[in-house]
């Protein structure tokens, strides 16, 4: 069984891979980085007009980083919304993914947090800078290979 979006992508020969369904029956699809821009636009046009959340995680020490998008298709007059989870995996050596800020404005702070914590750079994001850590912070704190500095700058709390 595939989601309607997955069926549509197969029909139009757009490359993706199903990673299965979660406990709520929501399908997770793996999207190639080079296809993410077009599949994001297609998802929006297909009706996934709400970005419920975007997050990122480190898959394994020295391995890939993942940017995860939970999309919801909300249409007037339907009782049950459709949801899909899209994952884009990138190399930690060059973690660059096209931003979807221009499609879903709610991606703004979420992509910035993923950048701040894991170092994933979102191409064409208009405000890509640290959001939680100070600008002077070195490294990406949520990467599994992150080495915590043995010093912390004491800051005036005034």
Curated annotation (Swiss-Prot):
Top enzyme class: translocase
Topology versus the membrane: Peripheral membrane protein
E.C. no: 7.1.1.-
Top-level lineage group: Eukaryota
Keywords (A to Z) from UniProt: Chloroplast, Membrane, NAD, NADP, Plastid, Plastoquinone, Quinone, Thylakoid, Translocase, Transport
Name of the protein described by the UniProt record: NAD(P)H-quinone oxidoreductase subunit J, chloroplastic
Presence of the UniProt keyword Amino-acid biosynthesis in the record: no
Chain segments annotated as coiled-coil in the UniProt record: none
Catalytic activity: a plastoquinone + NADH + (n+1) H(+)(in) = a plastoquinol + NAD(+) + n H(+)(out); a plastoquinone + NADPH + (n+1) H(+)(in) = a plastoquinol + NADP(+) + n H(+)(out)
Membership in a protein family: Belongs to the complex I 30 kDa subunit family.
Swiss-Prot/TrEMBL GO biological process terms: photosynthesis, light reaction
Function as written in the Swiss-Prot or TrEMBL entry: NDH shuttles electrons from NAD(P)H:plastoquinone, via FMN and iron-sulfur (Fe-S) centers, to quinones in the photosynthetic chain and possibly in a chloroplast respiratory chain. The immediate electron acceptor for the enzyme in this species is believed to be plastoquinone. Couples the redox reaction to proton translocation, and thus conserves the redox energy in a proton gradient.
Gene3D superfamilies per record: NADH:ubiquinone oxidoreductase, 30kDa subunit
GO cellular component: chloroplast thylakoid membrane
Primary residence: plastid
Molecular function per GO: NADH dehydrogenase (ubiquinone) activity; quinone binding
Localization terms from the record: Plastid, Chloroplast thylakoid membrane
UniProt cross-references to Pfam families, sorted A to Z: Complex1_30kDa
Subunit structure and binding partners: NDH is composed of at least 16 different subunits, 5 of which are encoded in the nucleus.
